[in-house]
């Protein structure tokens, strides 16, 4: 199935080179989403099948760190290549997919498990069974609203915020003073004779996560899932507040805000996804992970909610205010989550 996912990914990415109409791009992106829908639950299920209660938090942390190697390098490489031609960025993505296919063929080994002899209808019945648990379905919806909407809002808005609302020439000088002209030059471009930081090269968390995720997971594994998740949301909310303050003239705060959001993400995201996966028996881990992506999908509404809101605040001369609203969203969500846990109870993880 991993091979099937790659074979679905590859032509979809290459089609972006030739597609020009809105409908064509939309259909191509749906095809990429279909490939991701195959790929991601398989990987989560593999991690679940090869870990137990003693090492699952670390296992999911390692997986999350590896995901963010791509999350770190991808925006930097794409940012450099799209400055030359968008086609080069798509060629690089296709090459990475081809490399994943080769690595899978050479190194991936199927985890030991009992083979299921179930027909498609029986599998669909299991999905209905999982979602018919109103407490579980309500929890997924709540996680989508409380966490995934602000999460995706960060990635939708941060590069735009940096490029349009901050002094990117001053950001270049700050980076040059700390990391040197070589690194700062790689993360910037020339615009009218001045070096300016490209928003997409710094407005992500992957480079932070791939360095410190495992250490964070080691600390977080000592705590129960929901309190750990709530702590992550609090740290992310603080990051949003700092990001908003960067628009007041202290542009260097954008780096601190991104770092704090990354720490919150490292605490909250792998922990809550591990928790949802461990609500199911090992043989149904992929199924429950698939339902988890329904919560992730709720985050798509961040574009509808927060991108127009940013535009309104920016037009009014207060672009940083959108981050304060996002911080309030997380804090209010924590209160709703606590109320839900009190009324519906905490769902128990499956024993090994």
Show which residues each predicted segment covers.
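Helix-breaking motifs and short loop linkers at transmembrane-helix boundaries and internal kinks
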Residues: 18-23, 245-249
């Amino acid at each position: 199935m991993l091979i099937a996912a790659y074979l679905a990914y590859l032509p979809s990415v290459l089609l972006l080179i030739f597609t020009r109409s809105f409908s064509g791009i939309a259909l191509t992106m749906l095809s990429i989403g279909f490939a991701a829908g195959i790929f991601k639950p398989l990987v989560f299920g593999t991690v679940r099948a090869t870990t137990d209660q003693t090492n699952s938090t670390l296992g999911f942390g390692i997986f999350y760190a590896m995901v963010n190697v791509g999350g770190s390098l991808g925006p930097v490489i794409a940012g450099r290549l799209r400055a030359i031609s968008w086609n080069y960025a798509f060629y690089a993505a296709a090459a990475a997919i081809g490399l994943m296919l080769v690595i899978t063929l050479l190194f991936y080994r199927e985890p030991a498990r009992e083979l299921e002899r179930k027909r498609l209808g029986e599998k669909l019945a299991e999905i209905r069974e999982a979602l018919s648990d109103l407490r579980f379905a309500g929890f997924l919806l709540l996680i989508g609203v409380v966490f995934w909407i602000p999460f995706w809002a960060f990635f939708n808005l941060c590069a735009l915020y940096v490029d349009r609302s901050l002094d990117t020439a001053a950001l270049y000088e700050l980076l040059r003073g700390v990391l040197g002209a070589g690194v700062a030059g790689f993360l910037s471009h020339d615009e009218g004779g001045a070096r300016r930081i490209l928003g997409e090269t710094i407005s992500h968390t992957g480079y932070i996560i791939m360095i410190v995720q495992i250490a964070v997971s080691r600390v977080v594994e000592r705590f129960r899932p929901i309190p750990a998740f709530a702590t992550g949301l609090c740290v992310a909310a603080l990051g949003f507040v700092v990001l908003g303050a960067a628009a007041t003239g202290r542009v260097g705060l954008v780096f601190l805000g991104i770092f704090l959001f990354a720490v919150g993400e490292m605490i909250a995201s792998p922990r809550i996804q591990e928790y949802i996966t461990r609500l199911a028996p090992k043989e149904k881990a992929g199924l429950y992970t698939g339902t988890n992506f329904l919560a992730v999908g709720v985050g798509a509404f961040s574009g509808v909610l927060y991108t127009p809101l940013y535009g309104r605040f920016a037009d009014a001369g207060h672009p940083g205010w959108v981050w304060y609203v996002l911080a309030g969203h997380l804090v209010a969500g924590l209160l709703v989550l606590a109320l839900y846990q009190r009324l519906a109870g905490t769902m128990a993880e499956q024993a090994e």
